[in-house]
């Protein structure tokens, strides 16, 4: 499985999200409790979510050993008042390195690595933020679609 990387222009996506500090490699244990809170909030606020995606927004630290802020969110249709752990946030706008990961979530690291290698080979600088836009889960995990985008400087 080898992803193709392209440069795209990303538009901001508005999210209802819960931010957590997570070490690289521990996202798998943190995402569900955070998203459960977001979905509970959305059920209590009808019309806020119409057809958006689950999106994880990563705020990369300069030290790869440090925890990073991750906004575990759901795309929403309008602005809202934050409540408790639920924050209003947006993905960045601008030029991004973008790749489509096709396959199990457990193998997304491979697509992230392809983007990092592409950036290095093309002398592009990553700007410290990336996000994953999740499609609907497939019955066959090998068919899951997740768009991965890294903001470029």
Name these PLM-found stretches.
Residues 1-153:
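A solvent-exposed interaction/effector surface
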């Amino acid at each position: 499985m080898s992803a193709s990387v392209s440069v795209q222009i990303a538009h901001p996506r508005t999210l209802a999200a819960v931010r957590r500090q997570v070490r690289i490699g521990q996202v798998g244990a943190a995402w569900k409790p955070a998203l459960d809170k977001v979905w509970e909030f959305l059920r209590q606020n009808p019309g806020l979510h119409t057809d958006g995606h689950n999106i994880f927004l990563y705020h990369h630290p300069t030290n790869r050993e440090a925890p990073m802020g991750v906004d575990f969110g759901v795309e929403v249709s309008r602005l809202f008042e934050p409540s408790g752990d639920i924050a209003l946030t947006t993905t960045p706008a601008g030029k991004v390195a973008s790749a489509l990961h096709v396959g199990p979530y457990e193998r997304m690291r491979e697509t992230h690595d392809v983007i990092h290698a592409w950036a290095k080979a093309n002398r592009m600088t990553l700007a410290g933020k990336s996000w994953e836009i999740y499609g609907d889960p497939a019955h066959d995990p090998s068919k899951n679609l997740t768009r991965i985008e890294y903001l470029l400087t």
